[in-house]
Design a protein with these regions (language model features):
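Carbohydrate-active catalytic/glycan-binding domains of CAZyme proteins
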Residues: 1-150
Length: 150
């Protein structure tokens, strides 16, 4: 093996749980659960799946709740955003995830990963959901023992 391709684990020095990776042209992008950390929903970039850099964040603060703003003795530790899915379709990036502290599903979209991101809320908690695109239609798939599509 050539020395320039030899990598040692961990490739990333931090914990990036629930990763989702897409490729757009010659670039890979990864999102990961960031839970209660702000700014939230980190997006990493790589050209070879071994060397990653922080590229952007989707939001500064998800909601202005006491938990997320650390007010009135409250916090969102271990809560926040979980299990993001990143997709690219017809020149637009889409990102969907749930937030344990708000009990909502959030759908963001932007033409560029640096933003600005348009935030939409979906009532309901669709944990581990995924976005699928087929013939110009978008679908949200979720479930554990049974798979649901909306």
């Amino acid at each position: 093996m050539e020395e320039k391709w030899k990598k040692v684990n961990p490739v990333l020095p931090l914990d990036y749980p629930d990763p989702d990776v897409i490729r757009v042209d010659d670039t890979y992008y990864m999102v990961s659960t960031t839970m209660h950390f702000m700014p939230g929903c980190v997006i990493l970039r790589s050209y070879n799946l071994a060397d990653w850099e922080i590229y952007s964040y989707v939001y500064e603060t998800l909601e202005l709740t006491d938990q997320e703003c650390l007010k009135n003795g409250k916090n969102a530790y271990g809560q926040g955003m979980w299990a993001a899915t990143l997709r690219y379709e017809k020149g637009m990036f889409y990102l969907i995830f749930v937030a344990n502290d708000t009990g909502k599903t959030y759908l963001f979209r932007a033409p560029d990963l640096k933003g600005p991101w348009q935030k939409n809320e979906i009532e309901g908690f669709y944990h581990d959901c995924s976005l699928l695109f087929d013939e110009g239609r978008a679908f949200l798939a979720y479930g554990n023992r049974q798979i649901y599509v909306m």
